[in-house]
Design a protein with these regions (language model features):
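N-terminal secretory signal peptides and thylakoid transit peptides that target proteins
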Residues: 2-23
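Rossmann-like dinucleotide-binding domain that binds NAD(P)(H)
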Residues: 90, 204-278, 282-289, 344-351
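A contiguous active-site-proximal alpha/beta segment in oxidoreductase catalytic domains
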Residues: 153-223, 361
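N-terminal Rossmann-like dinucleotide-binding module
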Residues: 27, 31-103, 194-197, 227
Length: 393
């Protein structure tokens, strides 16, 4: 399966990639449902989850929305770069939300649902809250608010399907993506795969490397990259590793290495043709180099591509190169109320991620049939008590 159009929601990834840079021109296409109100013409955004392992906490996304204290951010020598502004924020620790609000000029709220009706879009920026996304986003989806939900979306297919149900029933677009889906190498590799199909090539296999050192949070970097290139027609998956998290916790084991294997049941892409022969894509996940490589083997030879390392003292170009396309994808969804990836594609990505997790945790890295994953199987959270359930009433 592949990113596809679902109803009137467009999701052609190449169209999006080529138009994302001009997305601010789409403001006039906003519906009345999402039209910002008040003095500002900017899209009003609410953010939640500002603590450990949050893209907002590390100043990755926030300065792309708001100028810190109304001025140019000391780490970011730039002015406004998007058509969005963070107006409200929430965190499980109200003091942290207050500090964020003071820094970026927005309003901190005490309850997770206090932003409903006050924002045009919601960004769920954390990782530790993933186990509770299904509850945290419910009131926003029920209100029809477009929601960006950070990877890996859900820890069970039951929760993933509930989020999708709420999205569909309330016409509330959702987005779950990763910056490695937007890098140039992913686009070039996808186009190359399509060309191989048009040329009648037979795929023999592929090998890849990924920066990630822990499956639960950053393993999706590599997984989502591969799915952006080859699609989601994965029949079986395995994950061999010595752990799954970056540190030891009461529920987690420390991970230093991992190997992901995707068994594709052939390959088919609209307008490009198909290849019926099954093949395996293998990816070595290591720590800590921030790069991705891919080599594709076919019946006429090899083709490879590499995403150069982006580590270094100057994080400014790295952050913009990697993270800005994701922020623009949020803006596009908030403005147009269209989904880039279909609900089916989001569910496919989540199912493959969870099946690999199950392979590691319960089957010593054996290949598991993706379709056989029970909806109620739940992957562990490294911080199982991160959210106090009493906040949900």
């Amino acid at each position: 399966m592949k990113p596809c159009t679902e109803g009137t929601m467009t999701s052609d990834r190449r169209t999006f990639i080529t138009t994302a840079a001009a997305v601010t021109a789409a403001a006039g296409a906003q519906t009345a449902h999402s039209q910002p109100s008040g003095k500002s013409d900017l899209i009003r955004v609410g953010v939640m989850a500002l603590g450990d392992n949050s893209h907002m906490n590390y100043d990755i996304w926030a300065p792309m929305f708001n100028l810190a204290n109304g001025e140019i951010h000391p780490k970011w020598p730039i002015g406004r770069t998007t058509n969005m502004i963070i107006t409200h924020c929430w965190d499980r620790e109200y003091e942290r939300a207050e500090a964020f609000a003071k820094k970026f000029g927005c309003t901190a709220v005490k309850n997770y649902d206090d932003m409903v009706g006050k924002v045009d879009g919601l960004v769920c920026a954390g990782f530790n809250e993933c186990k509770w996304w299904v509850k945290l986003v419910r009131p926003y989806l029920e209100a029809g608010t477009p929601c960006f939900i950070n990877r890996p979306f859900a820890y069970s297919m039951k929760d993933a399907k509930e989020i999708v149900r709420l999205s569909k029933e309330n016409n509330a677009p959702i987005l779950c993506t990763d910056e490695r889906e937007y890098i140039q190498q992913a686009v070039v590799a996808r186009n190359k795969v399509e060309q191989f199909l048009r040329d009648g090539r037979t795929f023999l296999g592929a090998d890849s490397t990924n920066a990630s050192g822990e499956w639960s949070q950053h393993g999706v970097h590599g997984l989502y990259f591969l799915l952006a290139v080859f699609g989601t027609n994965v029949k079986k998956v395995s994950y061999v590793a010595d752990g799954w998290w970056k540190e030891k916790t009461p529920t987690a084991t420390l991970q230093h290495y991992g190997q992901l294997n995707l068994l594709y049941d052939g390959l088919s892409m609209d307008g490009a043709g198909s290849s019926e022969r099954p093949f395996i894509v293998s990816q070595h996940q290591c720590w800590p180099k921030a790069d991705i490589s891919l080599r594709i083997s076919h019946d006429m030879g090899l083709w490879d591509i590499q995403h150069e390392a982006t580590t270094g003292d100057n994080t400014f170009p790295r952050h913009f190169y990697l993270f800005f396309p994701t922020v623009l994808a949020m803006q596009r969804m908030f403005e147009t109320r269209e989904m880039q990836w279909s609900h089916e594609y989001i569910l496919d990505k989540t199912r493959i991620f969870l099946t690999a997790f199950k392979s590691h945790l319960e089957h010593d890295g054996a290949m598991l049939d993706v379709a056989s994953l029970p909806d109620d199987w739940e992957a562990p959270s490294p911080y199982a008590d991160w959210i106090d359930e009493s906040i949900f009433g």
